[in-house]
């Protein structure tokens, strides 16, 4: 069994597919040469950001499309159109989360292939609990939100004598994030919408409970000047979204409004030792489970080693 990956992918999705292939004893190959696709010594074709019609490759080839085609689909995209009955058993497009599927369907009537919410697996071996000393009550992660929300959170944490460290999204390396996770009792996540939310889920994989200041829509994401990124759609679309695409009460607490922070924070602190976020991850978000679900949708029967 062999998977051929053609075209650009976000490094985290690529890493997930590569590890998943190892888990399932599937050979992985990357190419940026289009003609390579037509040498049919492989079984699965992954196209993260390119549309290639299933009719242009051998019929025995299974195809995974996505997730990097667009922010919002448009009617002129070649993947958009009535569902093709001849293709639906051998290929699909993954948006990674239900809210993303719903937004896509709000912009176009249908895709020519099934559009599914199939997340990519996490590296639970790397993102795992360890015995590091917990020196922070909270790691505060801030990503693309109104700065007033961050300042309010800081004021609340300080008023409760909490020790915390702030990570501004885009200003740190992955290893730094992992190191700080392991030194923290919990994470206060003040972020935007997430198609999957690898970093959110990696905290859970480390068994670090999350206190999430969740979003209701894409309109809560702002640029460096505090202007909503998706302002052109205000009054035209709802753009309903979430920060946490996979969630359970054992992962922590979620709130939406500033006035909910103090009470939710107190609940979180009181219940801190009762959360088991890694248990949720191991049940739902491992490479074996996530890639296994993709294989099942392609009618490929393989067991992870």
Show the residue positions of the predicted features.
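Conserved catalytic-core segment of nucleotide-activated headgroup transferases in glycan assembly
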Residues: 103, 120-177
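Active-site proximal beta-strand in glycosyltransferases
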Residues: 44-50, 56-77, 94
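A short, active-site helix/loop in glycosyltransferases that binds the activated sugar's phosphate group
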Residues: 90-112, 147-149
